[in-house]
Every structure is written in C-alpha cells, then in structure tokens.
Amino acid sequence: MSRQDTKNQGSRFDRAVAIFKKHGGILRTAQALRAGIHPTTLYTMRDSGALDMVSRGVYRLAGKSPLGDPDLVTVATRVPGGVICLISALAFHELTTQIPHEVHVALPRGAEEPRLDHPPIRTYRFTGEAFTQGVETHRIDSVSLRIYSPEKTLADCFKFRNKVGFDTVVEAIRFYRERRSVKVDDLMRYAAICRVKKIIRPYLEALL
C-alpha cells in the first residue's frame, strides 16, 4: 500500500469513527453505510478491533464502557419499529421480581418478524392505539429505547395475564403503588384501550 493509500485509509477511518461517535458509538450496518461509511472501512475497523460486534449487524466503538443492558440495546437497534413491553417493560420500570429470559417486544400487525441470533425475543402483535399509545423513549447506552410507560404496561399485562401469569400482574400493581406516583386516570385510559377496564377496576380499588 502506498503512502497516499495509507493516508486515505486513515482519513476514512477517522471519518468513520467520528460518525460512530455522533451516533453514540453504536450503529447497525445499514445505518453506517447510509451515514457514509464505506463497507470496506467498516469491515476493516471490525477486523482490526476498532469495532466490537454487539450482535449480527450491530457494531460499537471498542474501548467504551460495557453496555448496561446489552439485550435491550441490541433489540432497540435491530428492531427500531418495536416497543419493549410486558415482562421486559416491568423489569425496566422495576415493577417485578421476574428476570426476563427473553426480550418482550410489541410490533404492529403486519410487521416483519425480526431475525436475531441473540438475544432471544418474544413478539406480540398490537393494533391501533394499543400499539401507539403509552410509548416512552429512554436513552440507554446512547441508544433510543422505545418502551411502554408503567401505566400502559400494567394494562397490557392484564390483557395478556394468561401469558405473563396473574401473580406477576398482582405483584406489579403492588410495586406500582409502593414505588410510583399513582396515575389512576392514565391506568384507566390504557385499560379502556386494552379492553380490560372491567377486569382491572376491582384490583385498582383494592390495591390503590
């Protein structure tokens, strides 16, 4: 390689690092290419150890602090149209003692099923306001994470009580009362959207 080629490669490398830093140090392959990083530069950075592979097709600048929650970061990056829900959302909001063995993700009906080697995920199909309402965006390890609010998550858990377990639902209500400012109006609004208003009302009256 000539001195000029080496200089050009170094310039492309530095530009790629700057692009990664602009995006919090983590990018999907498609994002990196759209941002102007040449495929050869991307794979050279990977092979030289300048990038760590978080998951297939997800790269992160090497040398950064360990990810606080690599599973959520991977899903947020690989499934940007999804919303973290149910047990995973309860765990994020500290409303359960359950340790999720899969990342629970809501998708709009008709969306393509994600293909991830890791982490394992469980998808749920939500429609209309049941999908769009109650979504919060949090920054985690410099990545935007879409996740349902505590109140929307409780309503979802009542709706999917046969899947998450009713003991988990009751525990979540109790933790919500103890650890959060109770927003009854929001709870009932999301319960109406999820069509569990009649089911949730007596538990709210008893526990809240």
Question: Language-model segments: what does each one mean?
Answer:
Residues 1-7:
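Short, Lys/Arg-enriched N-terminal segment that forms or immediately precedes the first helix
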Residues 49:
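Glycine-centered, phosphate/nucleic-acid-interacting loop/turn motifs that mediate DNA/RNA or nucleotide
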Residues 11-31, 35, 41, 46, ...:
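Nucleic-acid-binding surface
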